[in-house]
A protein has these predicted regions:
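Interfacial transmembrane-helix boundary/kink motif in multi-pass membrane proteins
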Residues: 34, 120-143, 203
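Alpha-helical transmembrane segments of multi-pass integral membrane proteins
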Residues: 143-152, 188
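Selective recognition of hydrophobic, aromatic-rich stretches within alpha-helical transmembrane segments
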Residues: 2-7, 11, 81-118, 159-199, ...
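Membrane-helix interface segments in multi-pass membrane proteins
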Residues: 46-94, 150-176, 230-242
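Nonpolar helix-loop interface/hinge motif
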Residues: 2-57, 121-124, 174-241
């Protein structure tokens, strides 16, 4: 019988390479529960989102065909309303899917860290309390995040209007980008720990500035990998439209 590998510790200082190794080791060890619970939660949303995207593409093509023929304002108006409806539904489902997937992944990681048995024998019913807790917290982070973006956008717009020198405005935008990097660990801190959202924000900045370069590198690498996987999975759908 193969000996079980040591549990992957969360709260450990690691180099950049060790962070990537720990991430892929966790996925390799727990890909079955990750796949199972993701399918349970995301498949219904994906089906509805696929229908809305199909309606959106069909409506777009139909509207494009109308431009080459006779113009009927009532038909065009109805087609535009249908496009807005399909796109709104697609956006809402995308938002729900992002919230559900984020909440699920962090619930599984926290459960893995707290149980001696790791994720062995974990059921969706066992995850439900933690999952609902994470959903509420992710929505709260999104709301406060949108407010912060609007606030910063107003400040940037005001500075760009008042200060005539574009170099100063550019430096301010660059400063905003630098300060925004620690926000990448705001959600992990808030979802992993039982603390208030403001305390999580303070801790994210304290830890984020200390590991600023690592956060940027991890974000770039993971974003690159996600883009490749997304491109591969979208090939079939795009080829079907050609």
């Amino acid at each position: 019988m193969e000996a079980q590998k040591p549990k992957i510790a969360l709260y450990v200082q690691r180099s950049f390479g060790e962070k990537l190794t720990a991430t892929f080791d966790f996925i390799k060890e727990n890909w079955k529960p990750l796949m199972k619970f993701t399918t349970y939660l995301m498949l219904p949303l994906c089906l509805l989102q696929g229908l809305s995207l199909n309606g959106l593409m069909s409506g777009t093509m139909a509207l494009g065909d109308m431009t080459g023929g006779s113009f009927d304002s009532s038909v065009v108006g109805a087609s535009i309303m249908a496009l807005v409806t399909y796109y709104s539904l697609y956006a809402v489902l995308y938002l729900l899917g992002t919230v559900m997937l984020t909440s699920l992944v962090y619930a599984l990681v926290r459960t893995y860290n707290e149980r001696e048995e790791r994720l062995e024998g974990v059921t969706l019913g066992m995850l439900k309390p933690l999952l609902f807790r994470n959903v509420r917290r992710v929505f709260l982070i999104m709301i406060i995040g949108v407010l912060l973006v609007l606030f910063v956008g107003l400040i940037v717009g005001f500075i760009a209007t008042v200060i005539p020198f574009m170099a100063i405005a550019f430096l301010f935008v660059l400063l905003v980008v630098v300060v925004s990097v620690p926000l990448a660990i705001w959600a992990p801190v808030y979802l992993f720990e039982d603390i208030y959202i403001i305390d999580a924000l303070k801790k994210a900045y304290r830890l984020g500035f200390a590991t600023w370069g690592g956060i940027v590198l991890i974000s770039i690498v993971m974003g690159f990998i996600a883009a490749i996987l997304q491109g591969v999975t979208m090939i079939h759908g795009i080829s079907g439209l050609l």
